């Protein structure tokens, strides 16, 4: 909840839970977006969020936090209040998330695209194919399949 307030999400977790309940009651499948790399979040926070989504949604879209021009996040970043994830850190976290998500959950996206004209950091995210290949390579290297730890 503290991260939600920091990024001005605009609603509490209970609102998400209620929306999920109502949508399920009418047969709608739930796909939840998850931003990875938010300020002050630890690896444990990230994995806890992924586990929660794994229990509540049918699908997930993973998104790296992009620091864009003219945003409060940029101001915080420039003051050194937090650091953007490295490509290696992102790949490691995504692999761990995949390992704990239920096997039946659809993973709709492993990373997103930042507008190159607006993106300040992390610039490595502009090389999307390289990131996806890095995730695939690391999954094979660690012998991870989706749900292996769920």
Residue ranges of predicted features:
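Auxiliary Fe-S-binding modules of radical SAM enzymes
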Residues: 59, 66-150
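Histidine- and/or cysteine-centered catalytic micro-motif in compact active-site loops
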Residues: 35-36, 63-67
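Bacterial c-di-GMP phosphodiesterase catalytic domain signature
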Residues: 2, 61-64
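Short, well-ordered coil/turn segments that N-cap beta-strands
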Residues: 24-30, 56-58, 101-105
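Conserved non-cysteine loop/helix-boundary elements of the Radical SAM core domain that shape
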Residues: 1-27, 36-56, 75-88
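Ser/Thr-centric signal marking residues that sit
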Residues: 32, 49, 71
């Amino acid at each position: 909840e503290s991260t939600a307030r920091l990024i001005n999400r605009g609603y509490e977790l209970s609102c998400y839970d209620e929306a999920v309940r109502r949508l399920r009651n009418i047969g709608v499948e739930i796909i939840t977006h998850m931003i990875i790399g938010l300020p002050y979040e630890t690896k444990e926070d990230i994995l806890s969020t992924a586990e929660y989504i794994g229990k509540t949604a049918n699908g997930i879209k993973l998104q790296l936090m992009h620091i864009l021009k003219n945003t409060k996040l940029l101001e915080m970043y420039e003051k050194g209040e937090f650091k953007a994830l490295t490509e290696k850190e992102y790949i490691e976290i995504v692999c761990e998330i995949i390992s704990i998500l239920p096997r039946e959950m659809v993973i709709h996206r492993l990373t997103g695209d930042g507008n190159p004209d607006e993106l300040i950091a992390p610039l490595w995210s502009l090389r999307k194919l390289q990131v996806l290949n890095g995730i695939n390579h690391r999954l094979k290297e660690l012998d991870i399949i989706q749900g292996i730890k769920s």
